Amino acid sequence: MAFPDITEDDLNELMREEAEDVFDDDGVSSRFPDIMAAGTHSPGGPNGIIRSQSFAGFSTLQERRSRCNSFMGNSAVQKKPISKPRKPHLSGHKSSSSSSSSREPQPKRVEEVYSALKQGLDEYLEVHQTELDKLTSLMKDMKRNSRLGVLYDLDKQIKTIERYMRRLEFHISKVDELYEGFCIQRRLRDGASKMKQAFTASPSTKGTRESLAEVNRRYKEYTENMSTFEGELENLLGEFHIKMKGLAGFARLCPGDQYEIFMRYGRQRWKLKGKIEGNSKQSWDGEEMIFMPLISDLINIKVTELKGLATHVLVGSVICETKDLFTAMPQVVAVDVNDLGTIKLNLEVAWFPFDVEDLTLSSGNVSKATALQRRVSVYSQGTPETPTFQDTSFFKWQPRRWEGQRLSFLHTLRETLIEKLRRSRSFGDLAALRPRSRSSLEVYSTLPDDVFENGGCGVAECKRLSFTFSDTSTSSPVPVQSNPEITVTPPETDPSSEPPPTSEEQLVEEECVEEDCGSISVSVSVSDPDLEWDQVETQGPETGSVALSLCSESQLSAVGPEDVVFLEPNVSDEALELKPVELDGEEGSLTRQLVRRLTSSDMLPETSALSWAGENSRTFMESSLEEVIQSLLLRLESLGQRCGELQDLEQEVMRLEDLLKCRVHAHRSRSSSLSLTVESALESFDFLNTSDFDDDDTGDDAGTLSRAVFFDMESERMGSGQHPEARGHLSEALTEDTGVGNSVAGSPLPLTTGNENLDVAVVIHLQYCNHLIQLLTSGGSQLQHKTYLHKLATQTLLLEELSERNFDRPSSCTSVPDVLPGLVERPALMSLWSDCSGGLFHTTLDRVLKHMHLSFALGLQQVLPHSPDSVIKMVVNEMMDRSELASSSTSPAQDVITVFQFHRYIVEHCITDMEQHLLDLAKEVMLEEALSCGDPERSLKELKKVSITCLQPRSQTLLAVAGLLTTDDPEVMKATTDFLSSAASHQPFRSKAVDCYTQALSESELHTQRAACAALSCLQAVESIDAVILLCDSVDEELRQIAIETLLTFGEDGRLAYEQLDTVPREMVRLGTRRGNAVTTSF
């Protein structure tokens, strides 16, 4: 068939008519929020999926009109044009392979995701091959009776599909290559693990220890390689485009109900709120979100009903599997939110193998550049603001050279703030600060929310940032302004290495003295591993301001004099009551910390009482207290059958959450002065305000135009689909992104115990509980499950004691003696912990190791000359409940140990003197080496002189003793038998020995199983009879004989078990014989 010629005027007319069908004459207000309406009549037919007949889309104008009309007729409110879906928080996600190498690889999960990904890619390839065949046959039919223009367009589409298919094939080859490399590293790691077990079981010699160290190094290397391959494979998973279709529930959703849906996928988050309208319509403030697929994480969905000012009712929370979403066709997913399934969340999920932004044509770059030049020309025509105190000579703008580096959010924020402050010189105008143009605002509107929620800066490696709000000192009798000083504090540096102040800085100080006022200096820098922090103090006689600089190898980019702002000396006395507040960028949301610290400053310890651990304690907490509690509750809810220990833990965690929420509500009822201080502090960040702006705020110097150009380029790069005014006022954005604020639908303030050091300790123990539950659900023997449940019960008791003793009284959790009275009864151990931590609730592992080395290494060297520090590391690892292999893969400066772990260890081992305990442990290590050396005379000598009460005992020692029961020397076997038989009367030793030997029965090495069987026989461990019965059917004749002999030594219970074991096979043999005869006779 022939297609009519369509001119450019006809196309413009058609586009105008289509736009009039979709939008009214007045258009859509640029300030209207992004609303998506979901009704019962879905567009595109019963499936709700619209797909064109070809890759580029051969849909007619009537079809497009009908689809638009059917969709818009279902909307309850006006809509703006559908914008590009925004991506959630991507800080730290898929940034580099170094971030992925720190996590533990998950081979089974990688295998599952790889199979699903490969199937999805093959399905994509088949779909496009079918599309290509269809277009190719269509082109052959149209060659004779069609115009050249139509054939040209069709040929372009065919070539586009062919290029896409070649890209898919290359993508598949990369996926296969990465997975093959992952499998190779997995097999190498499994081999290293088996070698480690072999060297561990062999006699300890110098060569064995060196080989074991090499195997451990290889094991760590293979593990890191697996994590690297896993991270690279994760980067090739594409994108999930999730569209909100609304909630569904018969007689459950009523008009006027408001709901909040929170989706969490690893570090990516999507929060949207909606309202149930009349006529089965719903309005939501979000339509579509892009999630980057992850390998190890699942999608957590939580639906909350908003009933009042601060009353939120949890409707339900579910965890969704993601490997089934790798399909070529979009899927409509109905998620049962509650247990009964009366409320369902309808989502449309589409998977794209590549980033959609990568598929744009090259012509798009020309249009972007044209739009960029047009916006720059428009914004440069405005009238600049009237400058304030512009006649001051040292207030001049000097454009900085960025040396080809792309600016981050923090650099952009810093430059905009400094330029505004330069012209205003009034801290009172800080609340009105905002970026300079509409194009500048698009940078903030399209930024990942993780910038506000997790404090990320969008780069792979970030140095620690710390914002300090302190009082500004002045000698004037007039009170200083209530706005606190904002300073970025770097890690401590040597004061002697600080450069002297420049002449311009001295002018700043002199001017500050003349005006008799405080100052503020702000310096925020991009994080770069090649850059180092340096500190320049510019402190006048009557001011206490500190200017910071970023020092590189060749130049010093210091805070210029234009960065200094003078405060007006007309404020209230309430500022004098504020205490310095330390905030850390690595902890998470800076605004969340700000509100928590300002609202609970009366309960914090004095600054003078805090050591370095107190100042930096928040850097150790990767997640907030609320996030860890919710994560643990979600994991507990995901378990089907829960035993008593898990139920008790869940009840205690929920009780803890309720107590902390009560504390937050109590904080809300504080005096109005502090509330106004918090509100004022939040308003100080309104320079991020994107709800309104000044079109004529264009600046008056050369630096302004360059920054406007950068904002436009950055906006185009990050995507201009989202409207720059969609975020609204910063207070609204903070309420939505961080859960703080005082809006009607806002979430409560962050949960806290009132002491940030105690917060960190509680978070570590909650994360430990989460880890134990993960181990519990990952398989293992029955004895291992019993051990995990016992540890969970211990953590439950700890949380219960903390809740009853501390959280119900505001002033009861400020020091260790208040929280752990039992530790005060041991003065020497209390002093040891205070020296390691400064009296706080946690400290770093590196500090503990160094202090214990200085205190006890000299005495240990006399007992264990070759490795005295190994005993100290052994004790600390047991405090933290981790293996030596895991401890060697992390840095001691990053690991944290809590006072509760320290106290649990000394209670379990009944320690009153740590030095004596270490000496006994060193002697036990020497005993283990003597028993494993293979010298019968030395082994006999050590067995005769060792005291059972002095042994801890360690698993390695117990296995070394059991190994002597399988030697060929009868004298050694008799001495070992007598030793274990006498040790059976010592209950602590017997309990640990039975657990150790029972666990050893499930190992793969025959030598270890034989020795453990013989040791259980000596201990008369009847409680291990089930594990011994399993070995009676072993293929190995010697092991089977030892298991039977051990079973017969267990008295009456063992004899009955052996008789049952002996009769069952005979009955089965007789039954099989009768059946065989019957079959033979019939034929």
Swiss-Prot record:
Residues 477-486 have a biased composition (Polar residues). Expressed in the eye, nervous system, and skeletal muscles. Expressed in the otic vesicle. GO terms for cellular component: apical plasma membrane; cytoplasm; cytoskeleton; filopodium; stereocilium membrane. Residues 81-92 have a biased composition (Basic residues). The keyword Membrane applies. SUPFAM superfamilies: ARM repeat. Residues 206-240 form a coiled coil. Keywords: Cell adhesion, Cell membrane, Cell projection, Chemotaxis, Coiled coil, Cytoplasm, Cytoskeleton, Differentiation, Hearing, Membrane, Myogenesis, Signal transduction inhibitor. Its main location: cytoplasm. One of its GO terms (biological process) is regulation of establishment of cell polarity. It holds the Pfam family PL48. It comes from the Eukaryota. InterPro entries: ARM-like, ARM-type_fold, FAM65_N, RIPOR3. It is found in: Cytoplasm; Cytoplasm, Cytoskeleton; Cell projection, Filopodium; Apical cell membrane. Belongs to the RIPOR family. Acts as an inhibitor of the small GTPase RHOA and plays several roles in the regulation of myoblast and hair cell differentiation, lymphocyte T proliferation and neutrophil polarization. Plays a role in fetal mononuclear myoblast differentiation by promoting filopodia and myotube formation. Maintains naive T lymphocytes in a quiescent state and prevents chemokine-induced T lymphocyte responses, such as cell adhesion, polarization and migration. Involved also in the regulation of neutrophil polarization, chemotaxis and adhesion. Homooligomer; homooligomerization is regulated by RHOC and leads to the formation of concatemers through the association of N- and C-termini. This is Rho family-interacting cell polarization regulator 2. It comes from Danio rerio (Zebrafish). The gene is ripor2.
